[in-house]
């Protein structure tokens, strides 16, 4: 489990829950971009898991490169993406690239269609 820390007024770090740190994750239809140094992939998958546990359809992809997920997690076709959404799982799409440890931006047609499916397959309305 990922621990998110927030500095208090006294400069002490205290743990913060995912829904407190990122309340928009409980709302549908958001695009999240992660920038910066280390920890992006870990945070990305934690956010994806949080979204799935809260009834969201989650599509994970990249506009540049992303560490390659285990092969069984990766979705290469729209049918695979649909199966993941129907099963209540996150879908991960991306293209192969020169670096065997990473995936690259997916083909545009797969991305656009998968993005639309993510919105249309919303299967749970969250309480407010």
Model-assigned labels for residue ranges:
Residues 2-6, 24-25, 35, 52-57, ...:
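Core catalytic machinery and nucleic-acid-binding channels of phosphodiester-processing enzymes
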Residues 116-119:
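Loop/turn-to-beta-strand initiation segments
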Residues 122-128:
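Conserved small/polar residues in nucleotide/adenosyl-binding loops
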Residues 49-103:
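N-terminal phosphate/diphosphate-binding loop that engages ATP/GTP or pyrophosphate donors
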Residues 1-30:
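Extreme N-terminal, non-catalytic leader segments
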Residues 22-52:
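Walker A (P-loop) phosphate-binding motif
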Residues 37-42, 65-66, 124:
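Gly/Ser/Thr-rich loops at beta-strand to alpha-helix junctions
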Residues 103-111, 124:
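Conserved mixed alpha/beta catalytic, RNA-binding, or beta-rich assembly cores of soluble enzyme
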């Amino acid at each position: 489990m990922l621990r998110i820390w927030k500095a208090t007024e006294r400069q002490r770090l205290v743990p913060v829950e995912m829904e407190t740190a990122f309340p928009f994750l409980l709302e549908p239809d958001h695009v999240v971009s992660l920038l910066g140094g280390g920890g992006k992939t870990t945070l990305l998958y934690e956010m994806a898991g949080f979204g799935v546990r809260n009834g969201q359809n989650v599509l994970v992809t990249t506009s540049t490169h992303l560490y390659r997920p285990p092969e069984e997690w990766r979705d290469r076709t729209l049918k695979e993406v649909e199966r993941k959404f129907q099963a209540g799982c996150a879908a991960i799409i991306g293209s192969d690239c020169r670096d065997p440890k990473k995936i690259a931006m997916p083909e545009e047609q797969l991305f656009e269609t998968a993005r639309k499916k993510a919105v249309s397959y919303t299967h749970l309305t969250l309480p407010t």
